[in-house]
């Protein structure tokens, strides 16, 4: 049997995504074992994922990582399920020279530490909104300008700064940019200032509740750019439930969706993954479950390519892996970040999120420019 440790947020503030990640790992474990296990030297070995709860607390994540390595003797790790916990768990894995494939870290600040043993299957934060810009620039009429509002937390600022840099490199004129305190209830002043600059595209980089307030207040103020785009919100049931018809034509991003049609070199496609997952757990997978399954598959393939569970050999196999999965391409740069993977662009159309970019995975065409509040 091959034992692999996993650090997940099963309780606390990040429990919802952590529980989905747990199911994603268990699906992968069961799928691998059903096909005969992990193949080493011609023989199949059952996979057992040894899960520890970090309670959504970074300090606990470090302690759980230490426990999995020193007490449970796990020499290969999965997780953690978010950036904050990974930031504390990764140095522990690095100290013990234990490979860690995380399903939840995408902050460039983490990967810029150039850890030797950390690998992440998510596309980095810096690329989160690049697809929205690429999509918009492919439309007619082609946008010329944008404005951006961003929450003051470090992750939102990271995404916003990267988005501005990418937009400028693509020739867009950034006519307005401002930061607001995370959790603020009134964005009308900033929205008015942004609208006054006359942007074709208006980006909001924050959290789901702030995205909802942006739509509500933009509608009240009759602010109508050609596109409203968000780092978080569109694509979730809560967003469309809160906004109803007003949610239509808003654009957001996701690391994965059940309708994603990726070319696969290993494992099943998104459609069959979603069906099998729903049969096993009684509900559809989300991007957090899918990322966990992808992380687990990546580690399995690395073990088989190394033909060993020795930490150093598996680490070396991870560093050169190139895998086309239902989740997207998995290929790590010299930081351990998965820069090969696209972030998918979704748009709410007729009350439901649909994939609109990249073209090779899209299930619908972008609705651009936004037809206006009266036509929602």
Residue ranges and their predicted role:
Residues 17-40, 161-168:
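Short, polar/charged alpha-helical segment
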Residues 1-28, 52-58, 81-82, 149-157, ...:
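Extracytoplasmic "Venus flytrap"
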Residues 215-293, 309, 353, 359-375:
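Extracellular/periplasmic periplasmic-binding protein-like sensory domains
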Residues 83-94, 192, 199-221, 295-298:
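Hydrophobic alpha-helical
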Residues 276-289, 298-357:
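Segments of small-molecule ligand-sensing domains
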Residues 61, 120-145, 185-188, 211, ...:
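Hydrophobic alpha-helical segments within soluble ligand-binding/sensing domains
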Residues 23, 71-177, 226-252:
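Extracytoplasmic ligand/sensor domains, especially the bilobed periplasmic-binding protein
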């Amino acid at each position: 049997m091959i034992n692999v440790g996993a650090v997940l947020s099963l309780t606390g503030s990040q429990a919802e995504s952590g529980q989905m990640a747990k199911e994603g790992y268990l699906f992968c474990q069961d799928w691998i074992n059903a096909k005969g296990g992990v193949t080493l030297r011609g023989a199949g070995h059952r996979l057992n994922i040894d899960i520890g709860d970090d309670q959504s607390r970074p300090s606990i994540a470090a302690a759980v990582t230490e426990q999995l390595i020193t007490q449970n003797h796990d020499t290969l790790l999965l997780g953690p399920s978010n950036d904050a916990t990974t930031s504390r768990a990764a140095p522990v894995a690095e100290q013990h020279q234990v490979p860690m494939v995380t399903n939840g870290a995408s902050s460039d600040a983490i990967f810029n530490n150039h850890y030797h043993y950390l690998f992440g299957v998510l596309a980095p934060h810096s690329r989160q909104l690049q697809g929205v810009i690429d999509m918009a620039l492919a439309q007619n009429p082609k946008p010329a300008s944008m404005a951006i509002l961003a929450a003051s937390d470090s992750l939102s600022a990271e995404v916003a700064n990267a988005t501005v840099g990418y937009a400028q490199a693509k020739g867009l004129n950034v006519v307005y940019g401002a930061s607001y305190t995370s959790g603020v209830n009134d964005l009308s002043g900033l929205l008015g200032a942004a609208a006054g600059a006359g942007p074709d595209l208006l980006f909001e980089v924050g959290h789901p509740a702030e995205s909802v307030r942006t739509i509500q207040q933009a509608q009240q103020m009759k602010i109508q750019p050609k596109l409203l785009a968000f780092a978080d919100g569109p694509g979730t049931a809560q967003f469309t439930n809160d906004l109803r018809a007003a949610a239509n034509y808003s654009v957001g991003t996701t690391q994965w969706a059940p309708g994603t049609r990726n070319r696969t070199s290993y494992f099943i496609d998104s459609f069959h993954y979603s069906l099998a997952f729903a049969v096993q757990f009684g509900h559809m997978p989300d991007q957090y479950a899918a990322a966990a399954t992808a992380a687990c598959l990546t580690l399995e393939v690395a073990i088989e390519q190394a033909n060993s569970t020795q930490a150093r050999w598996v680490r070396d196999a991870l560093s050169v892996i190139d895998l086309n999965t239902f989740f997207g391409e998995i290929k790590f740069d010299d930081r351990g970040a998965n820069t090969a993977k696209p972030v998918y662009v979704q748009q709410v159309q007729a009350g439901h999120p649909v994939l609109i970019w990249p073209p090779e995975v899209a299930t619908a065409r972008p609705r651009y420019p936004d037809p206006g509040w009266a036509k929602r």
